[in-house]
A protein has these predicted regions:
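Class I SAM-dependent methyltransferase SAM/SAH-binding core
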Residues: 53-55, 59-100, 125
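Conserved catalytic/acceptor-binding region of the Class I
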Residues: 141-207
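Conserved class I S-adenosyl-L-methionine
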Residues: 2-49, 63-67, 81-84
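A conserved beta-strand element that flanks and buttresses the S-adenosyl-L-methionine
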Residues: 112
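Core SAM-dependent methyltransferase catalytic element
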Residues: 188, 254-266
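C-terminal helical/coil "lid" or tail adjacent to the Rossmann-like core of SAM-dependent
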Residues: 3-29, 192-249
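A short glycine-rich, Lys/Arg-flanked "PGG" loop and its adjoining helix->strand segment in the class I
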Residues: 124-139
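Short catalytic micro-motifs in class I SAM-dependent methyltransferases
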Residues: 115-116
Length: 266
């Protein structure tokens, strides 16, 4: 799921050998109970008005935008995703950079971004843009996993920590950003800043899209010169033993950060 230059495939969907793979990946995740439940919470926080206009940054295939119960403008950097969301019924999707949104100031009644900031080259700029385009009093919600919170039952915890840390620090642009979002919201002068933490606990290795390729992470690190052959062999052997024994358990925390644009600008 990671390109040779270190960028995650979601940062360059249109350049991938098979862009449809990433469409399929989103569909699989949307089918998981954990994802459905926290997305319902995001909708509740937004409390969209049927007559309002809302923005989703990183709209993907448009699944969330289509069920929010209001007019939604989707933004995605990928033309593949924009076309797919339009084909599924989203009325408006714009191919654009999250750090340079093509909208006037103060036109949106609310906005959200789900699992997108972890991939952005300039996440702080993107947050500033969300604040800029919403109306005073509007709600902003950003959701991301924080891979610094990963835990895994594994016989060799030192090796597991090494592999999981590689995922957090090197397989994503902003793998541990989620824990900082509260401070960023405060610095952006948003009101009523709130953070909710939800733990994704996986007990079967084939669920959640094969846990995002967890078994392959060590070999990816090897390819970048960051892990030895011996460590990779040991990781894969122990991983297979854990799975065969029915002892697999991996977890990561998602952070739902929300706030309101002040009615009176400070």
């Amino acid at each position: 799921v990671t390109a040779p230059d270190g960028q995650h495939g979601f940062t360059r969907v249109d350049e991938e050998a098979r862009p449809a793979f990433w469409v399929e990946c989103l569909d699989k995740l949307h089918g998981e109970p954990f994802y459905r439940e926290y997305k319902e919470r995001v909708r509740a926080i937004l409390s969209p008005r049927p007559t309002g206009l809302y923005l989703e940054v990183g709209t993907g295939v448009g699944t969330d935008a289509l069920v929010i119960g209001a007019r939604v403008v989707g933004v995605d950097r990928s033309l593949t995703m924009c076309r797919e969301s339009l084909a599924r019924g989203l009325r408006t999707c714009v191919a654009a950079d999250a750090g340079a949104l093509p909208f006037p100031c103060g036109v949106m009644d609310g906005c959200w971004s789900d699992r997108t900031f972890q991939h952005l080259a300039h996440p702080r700029r993107a947050l500033d843009e969300l604040v800029r385009v919403v109306k005073p009093g509007a709600t902003i919600v950003v959701v991301d996993p924080d891979y610094g919170t990963q835990e895994m039952e594994f016989p060799d915890q030192c090796l597991a920590e090494k592999v999981l840390n590689f995922r957090a620090r090197h397989m994503l642009r902003n793998g541990t950003l989620a824990r900082q979002m509260r401070q960023w919201f405060v610095e952006a002068r948003l009101d009523d800043v709130c953070v909710e933490e939800r733990a994704l606990i996986v007990r079967h290795p084939t669920s959640v899209d094969n846990v995002m390729g967890l078994r392959s992470w060590a070999r990816t690190a090897l390819g970048r010169g960051m892990m030895s052959d011996a460590d990779v062999d040991r990781w894969e052997s122990l991983y297979d033993d854990v799975v065969a024994a029915g002892r697999f358990r991996w977890s990561v925390s998602f952070f739902i950060t929300s706030g309101h644009k002040p009615v009176v600008q400070r």
